[in-house]
Amino acid sequence: MLIFFCGKMGSGKTTLSKKIATQTNGIRLSEDELLSTLYPNRITNLQEYKQYSDLLKPVIEGITQQLLRKNLSVILDFPANTPTQRSWLKSMSDQEKSSHLCYFLDVSDEQCIEQLLKRANPMTDTKEMFMAVNKFFVTPQIEEGINIQEVDSETLK
């Protein structure tokens, strides 16, 4: 099974991904962790994020498909915040005839910003970055053909 997450910056996607990885004994891959390890201090704006994120995607796709072929649960802590991102994630499970689930974290902007400002990266974890990234956020729709599990802020506590 492939599990992925949709939620605004600071909504708790990483926290939930870690919890689910523990519960399912699945393999968790995190875009933030990979980017910060492979490209330390190189991402300071959205353009740089996209550039480096795009370099990861073909590698992650291959690894994910290999794991799904082995019937392992894969928890991808990669953003599923646009229809294009969700389509890419879903396509990996479709190609391997594996099931998928998208957790949608429905958390208010105020709560996201509050959580974001508590995080460790002062270069990217700012209200300004939240507003810039949030412009691209699209709530997932069942018409996209994805299995959605909604999670509210109370459930995340």
Which residues make up each language-model segment?
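Walker A (P-loop) ATP-phosphate-binding motif of ABC ATPase nucleotide-binding domains
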Residues: L2
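Conserved glycine(s) of the Walker
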Residues: G12
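Small-molecule kinase domains that catalyze NTP-dependent phosphoryl transfer to phosphate-bearing small molecules
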Residues: N121-K157
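Glycine-rich phosphate-binding loop used to anchor ATP phosphates in small-molecule kinases
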Residues: Y52-E96, H100
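Hydrophobic anchor at the beta1->P-loop junction of P-loop NTPases
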Residues: F5
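The conserved Walker
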Residues: K8-M9
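Conserved substrate/cofactor phosphate-moiety recognition/catalytic segment
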Residues: T15-L72
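Conserved phosphate-donor/acceptor-positioning beta-strand/loop module used by diverse small-molecule
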Residues: E96-Q115
